[in-house]
């Protein structure tokens, strides 16, 4: 009611299951929100068994239409969401040659060119019900609330679908992003067919009008869960993700042999075999691999950054190419790489070792009993630490099961935890072991935990761009992390403790790029995206009917509508009238 919105109406929209009711409900609920007309198209389904329909209608919010609507009707929201006041500064941090190699970048339009990020992940609504969510955000935006930073594009139910289903969705996304790059209303639909005569889309397309005045948006990067990214971009060598031999899209790292990813050293052979743009483009084969900027027609550009030109001479953290590399658009994410990767292994190994050493007491009995008691005491200590430091956490109790040790001493120690909880566990363990120096192994364990906590703290406290001191901290912490982990792994030979995983290799690329570019990895890590996934999951809790994907999209747009309404009311209040908040052209 504080927003002037009838809550029962909001609830009615949240329960909306029928596409035919959606737009009416939303307009009744959020009258100031002139909604973009949902784009409807047909997607194929997996009908190999002859059961059900072979097609269904998919709905989407076209990125270029959402961009145009916000610019015309809600300029304050447009300015905030796309960070238009800081575009000049953002592009100024990108080396000139790198940005100018992007096929759609115009150096004369830096202040009006939005670097766009496409985000994707699947939402598990139930054990057998999953939806693929696609979102867009500005790469120049930083520390915005998740609901404002990430704008909805589509929600696709994955049950009954196959690769053709998502490819059709990506085809529409690619077409819309091309329109954004050009800044003009498209004259035809995604199939190249003319718009229905007399429609607003036909009128705008025929006129060749600008989407958002002088503003355009170019696709600059893609981020999300790596499983989704590998599928969506279509890395041929990573169709089985980390079970295949070639595991990296940026260099020649392999699972074993002379180019093994297990060498935690920037002098490792794989870092001398950097992917060329041409080899990268040849290794991807999906609709998203044809995104604007990927589908290079100019032959002079396909050799940009070839491996022989990018061979490192004085190899070390912070060395990277200054040119725009297509393979660099697929981002490694610190949340998935560290908090849901390296730190799970580090915390699991450290907790089990410290319990074995009697940090929380020594107990008799079988494996599960004695470690269960010690780990429960550790969990109590962790909760006390979080309370004392004002850290919110919902970490389940430490047990041999939550540490992956149900099989006994031969188990693989890996903490089961959500990303934020895992970072808090790392911080606690780093504090607990900071003075450990009884032996080299204890010192190295302390160094690993300190380095991980230091990196997390630096990324959380830094701005969009790292200062020289912050970059030096990242450089130092990364070297300590890699060196100490290598020694811990050698100490643990013959066990599964301190194992090296492909995410160590991903972290090396991520940290090297952060030091070189000064860009804070927190500006593109997936915490906000994961928050949106959680909100979407809760918005359809207990509802597993066919229209669940439409309901997720409806809920996302209602939230955006309320943000726009708040902005309009705030603008009207600041000038003492409602001028400027009136709805504009509807699409």
For the regions a protein language model found, what residue spans apply to each?
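Terminal interaction-prone segments of large eukaryotic proteins
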Residues: 1-23, 407-413, 417, 421, ...
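Charged (Asp/Glu and Lys/Arg) segments that form or flank catalytic channels of large polymer-
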Residues: 11-14, 19-118, 186-431, 435-436
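Short, conserved catalytic/metal-binding motifs centered on acidic residues
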Residues: 121, 173, 244, 429, ...
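Conserved beta-strand elements of beta-rich interaction domains across eukaryotes
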Residues: 123-125, 139-143, 158, 249, ...
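Short coil/turn segments at secondary-structure boundaries
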Residues: 129-133, 148-149, 261, 538-541
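Compact, glycine/acidic-enriched structural inserts
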Residues: 133-191, 566, 570, 574-576
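Glycine- and acidic
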Residues: 148-164, 361-368, 408-415, 434-440, ...
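Well-ordered, non-membrane alpha-helical segments in soluble/globular domains
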Residues: 163-176, 180, 274-281, 368, ...
């Amino acid at each position: 009611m504080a927003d002037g919105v009838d809550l029962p109406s909001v609830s009615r929209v949240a329960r909306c299951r029928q596409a035919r009711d959606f737009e009416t409900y939303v307009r009744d609920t959020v009258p100031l929100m002139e909604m973009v007309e949902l784009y409807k198209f047909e997607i194929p389904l997996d009908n190999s068994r002859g059961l059900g329909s072979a097609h269904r209608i998919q709905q989407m919010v076209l990125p270029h239409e959402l961009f145009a609507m916000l610019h015309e009707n809600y300029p304050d929201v447009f300015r905030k969401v796309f960070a238009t006041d800081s575009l000049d500064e953002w592009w100024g941090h990108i080396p000139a040659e790198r940005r100018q190699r992007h096929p759609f970048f115009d150096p004369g339009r830096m202040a009006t060119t939005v670097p766009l990020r496409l985000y994707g992940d699947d939402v598990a609504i139930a054990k057998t019900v999953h939806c693929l969510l696609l979102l867009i955000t500005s790469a120049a935006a930083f520390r915005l609330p998740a609901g404002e930073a990430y704008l909805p594009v589509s929600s696709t139910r994955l049950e009954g679908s196959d690769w053709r289903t998502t490819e059709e969705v990506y085809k529409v996304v690619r077409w819309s992003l091309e329109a954004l790059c050009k800044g003009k209303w498209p004259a035809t639909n995604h199939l190249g067919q003319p718009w229905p005569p007399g429609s607003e889309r036909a009128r705008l397309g025929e006129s060749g009008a600008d989407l958002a005045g002088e503003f355009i948006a170019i696709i600059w990067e893609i981020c999300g869960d790596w499983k989704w990214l590998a599928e969506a971009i279509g890395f041929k060598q990573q169709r089985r993700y980390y079970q295949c031999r070639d595991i990296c899209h940026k260099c020649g790292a392999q699972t074993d042999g002379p180019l093994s990813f297990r060498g935690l050293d920037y002098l490792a052979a794989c870092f001398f075999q950097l992917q060329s743009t041409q080899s990268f483009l040849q290794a991807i084969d999906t609709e998203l691999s044809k995104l604007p900027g990927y589908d290079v027609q100019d032959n002079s550009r396909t050799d940009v950054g070839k491996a022989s030109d990018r061979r490192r001479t004085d190899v070390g953290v912070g060395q990277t190419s200054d040119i725009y590399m297509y393979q660099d658009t697929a981002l490694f994410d610190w949340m998935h790489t560290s908090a849901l990767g390296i730190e799970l292994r580090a915390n699991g190994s450290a907790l089990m070792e410290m319990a074995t050493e009697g940090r929380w007491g020594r107990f008799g009995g079988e494996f599960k009993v004695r470690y269960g008691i010690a780990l429960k005491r550790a969990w109590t200590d962790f909760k006390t630490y979080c309370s004392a430091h004002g850290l919110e956490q919902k970490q389940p109790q430490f047990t041999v099961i939550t540490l992956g040790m149900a099989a006994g001493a031969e188990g693989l120690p890996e903490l089961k935890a959500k990303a934020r909880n895992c970072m808090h566990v790392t911080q606690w363990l780093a504090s607990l072991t900071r003075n450990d120096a009884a032996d080299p192994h204890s010192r190295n364990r302390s160094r690993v935990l300190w380095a991980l906590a230091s990196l997390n703290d630096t990324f959380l406290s830094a701005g969009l761009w790292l200062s020289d001191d912050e970059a030096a901290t990242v450089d130092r912490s990364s070297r300590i992390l890699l060196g100490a982990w290598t020694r811990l792994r050698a100490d643990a030979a013959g066990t599964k403790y301190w194992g090296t995983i492909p995410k160590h290799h991903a972290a090396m690329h991520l940290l090297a790029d952060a030091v070189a570019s000064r860009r804070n990895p927190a500006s593109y890590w997936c915490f906000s995206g994961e928050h949106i996934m959680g909100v979407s999951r809760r918005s359809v809790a207990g509802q597993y009917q066919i229209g669940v994907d439409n309901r997720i999209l409806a809920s996302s747009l209602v939230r955006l509508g309320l943000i726009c309404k708040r902005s309009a009311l705030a603008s009207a209040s600041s000038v003492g009238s409602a001028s400027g908040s009136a709805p504009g052209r509807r699409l």
